Amino acid sequence: MASSDTGGKSETKSERDSEKGSCCLLADKIPARYVLAALFFVGHISMTISRGGFALAVVVMVNSSSRVTPANQTDTYQLCPSSGPGNASAQNDQGELDWSESLKGVILGAFFYGYIFTQVVGGLLEQKFGCKIVYGTSTLLGTVLSVLSPVASRTSPWAIFAVRFCMGLVSGVLFPCLYGIWGRWAPPTERTKLLAICYIGLPLGNIINYPLSSFLAAQLGWEYIFYIPGASAAVWLVLWFLLGYDSPAQHPRILEEEKKYIEEGIGTNRRQKPKVPWLKVLTSPPVWALVMGQFSSNWGVFFLTTQLPNYMQNVLGFNIQTNGLLSALPFAVAMVCMFASSAAADRLIQGGKIPKVWIRRGFVITGYTGMVICGVILANLSGCNPAAAVSLLCITQGFNSLTVAGFRAVHVEFAPRFSGVTFALANTGGTVSGIFAPLLLYLDIYLSQWYDQMYNTCHGLFQPTPAAWSTIFYIGAAIQGVGGIFTAVFLRTDVQPWARGEGDKGSFDKNVELAGSKDLVIANEHAEMPTKVVEMQNTKL
C-alpha cells in the first residue's frame, strides 16, 4: 500500500510537470531561468542596435563641408603629419544636415538627459508592476521613437533632440528592471553567469550595429539605420510577452525541481512587498561604492558608444565603411572578456577557497588598473598610430568588461530584495558620465580653439583634434582611477541589514537546519562564506 502511495505521488508530480506544455516546445525543454537570460540577451542586442546606430548615422547624415579646418589648425597635427584632417571629412560632404560640432554634442547627449530621470522610477515601477510589463512597454516605446528619428532629424535639430530625450526617458527603466527580476530568479552560485549572458548582448549589439549601420548607410541610406532594427525589436517583443515571467512562482511551465532550487537558494520571502528604507540606502557606503563604480566604468562605455565613430573619422582618418568595422572591434573584445571573466568568477566562488567579496574586488582592481594604464597611453599617442590606438581601445574595453564579474553582480547579492532600486541609484550616477563625456569633449575643443584664436589668429569653426582627445583620455583615466579605488575599498557582497525582510532570517535558518542534517552548507547569503553547496569534512554545522 505504501508502495502504491509512493507511486501515486510520483505519478501526480509527473503528470503535473507534463501538463506544463505550451506551443513553445523548445523553450519548455530549457530551464526557465536560462530562457529568461536568453530573452534579455537578444533584447539587449536589439536595444543596442536600435538606440546606438545614431552615433554612426550622425557621421553620415551631417554635412561637413561647412566646417572648414583653418590653415593654422594644422599646427595641432604637426607631431603626427599622417593624422591630419585629410580625406575623412571629405567623405561626408554629401550629408544633408548642417549641424555644428557643438550642436552634435548636445544632440548625442540628449539620450542621457532623459535616461537619468527614470533610473529610480524604473526600480519603483518594477517593484509595483513587475519587469515583464515595464520592460516590454519601454522597449515598445523606444522602438517607435527610433523609427521616428529620420523624420525628426529632417524637421529640426530640436525635434531630434526631443526624440532622443524621450528615448532616454523610456529606456531608463530597463536595467533597474533587469536587476529587480534577477533578484527573484538568480540562484547565488549562478548570478554572475546569468547576468553575464544578459550583458554580453550589449557588446554583441555594438559588434552588429557598427558594420550593419555603415552598410545600410552606404547601400540604402542612413534612414535605414533606424528602420531595420525597429522591425527586429517587434519580433523580440512577441517572444518577450510569450516567454517572460516575473518570478518562478508566476511561471506556468517551470519544473518543480527548478522552482525549488531557485527559491531555496535565494532563501528570502518573496511574497512581501517591502518599503524601500531610503535613508539607510542613501547612507550606505556599499551603495555609493556601486554608484562610483557605475559612473567611472560607464564613462568609458558611454564615451565610446557616442564618440567612437567621430574619433575614428576625425582623428584616425578612417572612411565610413572602415569606421563601422573598426568601431565594432572594442566591443568584440569586451564580449569575449566579459564571458571569460564571469565564468572564472563563478568558478572561484563555487570553489569556496576565496571569500566572495575578495573575488569581486579582485576583478574590480584588475579592470580599473588596466583601463587607467590604457587611457594614459592613448592620451600620449594623440592619434599618431591608428593601429595602436584601435588596439588600445580594444584592450580598454576588455578590462572594462571585467566589472561585470566585479561590482555589477553585487546588486543581487548585497540587497537582493532591493536590487532594482540600488541599481537604479548606481546607474543614475553612471548616466551622469554619459551626459558630461560628449559635452566635455566639445568644451575642450571650444577652449582649445578659443586659445588658438586669441594667440595664433586662427579663424574658423572648431573640429575635434588629437590634442582635445588627449585631454579627454587623461580625464577619463583619472576618473577611472579614483572610481576604481573607491569601489574596491567600500564594496560589500554580504546582505546588508536594511535589505533583509521579516521572512529572510527564518527562511535562512530553516535552510541551514536542513543542510546540517545532511552535513552540507547551503548557498549562503553572506559574502565572506563560500556559496557553493560543499560537503563538510568531519565537522558539524
Give residue spans per PLM region:
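Cytosolic juxtamembrane N-terminal segment immediately preceding the first transmembrane helix
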Residues: 1-101
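Helix-loop junctions at membrane interfaces in 12-TM secondary transporters
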Residues: 33, 151-163, 354-357, 377-392
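Extracytoplasmic gate region of multi-pass secondary transporters
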Residues: 51-55, 283-339, 401-408, 434-438
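Conserved MFS/SLC helix-loop-helix module at the cytosolic interface between two early adjacent transmembrane helices
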Residues: 117-158
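C-terminal ends and interior cores of transmembrane alpha-helices
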Residues: 140-154, 365-383
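Hydrophobic core of transmembrane alpha-helices in multi-pass small-molecule transporters
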Residues: 145, 157-173, 295, 374, ...
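Glycine-rich segments within core transmembrane alpha-helices of 12-TM secondary carriers
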Residues: 174, 183, 190-219, 224-236, ...
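Central mid-sequence intracellular linker of multi-pass
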Residues: 189-194, 217-283, 482-511
